[in-house]
UniProtKB/Swiss-Prot annotation:
InterPro entries: YbaB-like_sf (IPR036894), YbaB/EbfC (IPR004401). Belongs to the YbaB/EbfC family. It comes from the Bacteria. HAMAP family: DNA_YbaB_EbfC. This is Nucleoid-associated protein P9211_00201. Transmembrane segments: none annotated. Homodimer. NCBIfam families: DNA_YbaB_EbfC (TIGR00103). Keywords: Cytoplasm, DNA-binding. The lineage of its organism: Bacteria, Bacillati, Cyanobacteriota, Cyanophyceae, Synechococcales.
Length: 115
């Protein structure tokens, strides 16, 4: 047992190694999220928006037929697709971060909270 309730040197070394591994894994995860293309669509599938795993917009595709239905209809369809893509991207990021931190109870806002 270590003096004064402090962890022994071996425990401290192990904790630092673990922290370094998490940092390396976090960097790798960041790169994986950047490379992802997650597609969201509106209800009828005529508008699709792709975001990266870090919510960066990558591209948008609009079926020309929706433009013939008027500005308001097109705006609604684009917003639906954007919301779908954003939800997919954020949930993917959250899942991957939880895998990375696996049971460490870091209480990271937006990641470890109970939704």
């Amino acid at each position: 047992m270590a003096a004064f309730g402090l962890p022994n040197f071996g425990q401290l070394t192990e904790a630092f190694k673990k922290a370094q591994q998490i940092q390396q894994d976090a960097q790798k995860l960041q790169e994986e999220l950047d490379a992802m293309e997650l597609e969201g669509k509106n209800q009828d599938g005529r508008v699709s928006i792709c975001l990266s795993g870090n919510q960066l917009p990558l591209r948008i595709e609009i079926d020309p037929s929706i433009l013939l239905e008027g500005k308001e209809k097109a705006e609604i369809a684009i917003l639906e697709a954007l919301k779908d893509a954003h939800e997919l991207s954020t949930s993917t990021m959250k899942e991957r971060m939880q895998e990375l931190t696996g049971g460490l109870n870091l209480n990271l806002p937006g990641i470890d909270d109970g939704d």
